[in-house]
Each structure stands twice: as structure tokens, then as C-alpha cells.
């Protein structure tokens, strides 16, 4: 079952749309309630609607008995800017979970049933938010994640990314590198140092993707035991 929902967000100070896919009445046996829930974050330039319809999410939801919630990322790298009433990280990482559970009582409230994933920019957001809100998410899935957002944005070829995007979203490089909320690698260390249980991590990418060279070693050394799946190009 596919539903497009709208709810007022305190973090965004406005109404926000999100898409919900439930494993119910979709040609398969209905899944057992309450449903485990996956929050799927779009990449840069992609809308929630594109993700909801371009990928076979309804079939995956029905096959595996998992509800899927897809919000818009708004090219904001899931950062928080209260001065602009644009706290995308707070909205998606925490508030959207509360809103969706209240609107759809069939969703599980248990941490062990709550997952977050994303593609590219959404992969960065899933890692950053999953490691920040460790009490909410049990698993993180990353598809070609832009884990080193500073390297990606500051070294992007001309015309690929707006030149002022990194300072507008993250400030300077030092502020990004030192922030457990913005830098997923610092987020891993912060979670462990504070005694919080980091979510499990699964990562998927092509062999020629520009994933950070130290990502696997850092995650592995943190005892998160990441699972990595590499794909070769058929061309």
C-alpha cells in the first residue's frame, strides 16, 4: 500500500510531505504487525517521489514485510540550521519517526525494528543520523554513500555542485571534521566513547565508486562489524 502524507514539522516550521509504503494489500500475504520500518533518504538532486516510484520499494516492502518511509532531502545533506528554520537532520532523524508512528500505529516502536538507509547524500545522512540517534536506529544501510562530504563538495568538478554549498551547510572544514553530528567517523568514536550502542552497518557500492579509503577500517576498528558488498561494472 502506498500513501503520500503531509504533517506539520516543528523542526522545519512548516508542513512537509513524505511517502509511506506498507506491506499491506499489495498482492502478497499481509505482513505481521507491527511492521519493522525503514527510513529511506534520497541523494542529492533526487526527490522522495522519484525514489518511491523509480525503485521497486513496494515489491520489497511486500516481500520482506517492512514498512518504508521516504522523506525529501532538499539537497541539504541532512544538516540543521535553526536560523533558517531548516533543521533537516532533526526532522528526519527524530521527528519524522515520531510523526510516522503516530500517524500509522501499525509501525513498530522498537529500536530493533527501526532502520535508516540512503543513497549518496542520503547515505551520508543515514550514517550521520543513525550514529547520532543511536537510541532510535538499530541498523544503517548505505548505498554508494558520500561519507566524506567535505571532500566531495570541496573537490567536486565545476558545475557538479554549487561552489558555496559546503560552507553554507557545514561552515568550515575544521568545524565539520570535529563534529560528531556532522562527521560520521567522529560519530562512531563519540557513540563508543559515551557508551552508546552504535547501529549495525551494511554498505553497498561499485568497485569504482569514490568511497572513502578509510571508511571500512574505521568502522571495523570500532567493532561495528560493517558488511560491504562491491559490484563490478558490466561495461
Where are these regions (language model features)?
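Non-catalytic cap/lid and distal C-terminal segments of serine-dependent acyl enzymes
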Residues: 1-235
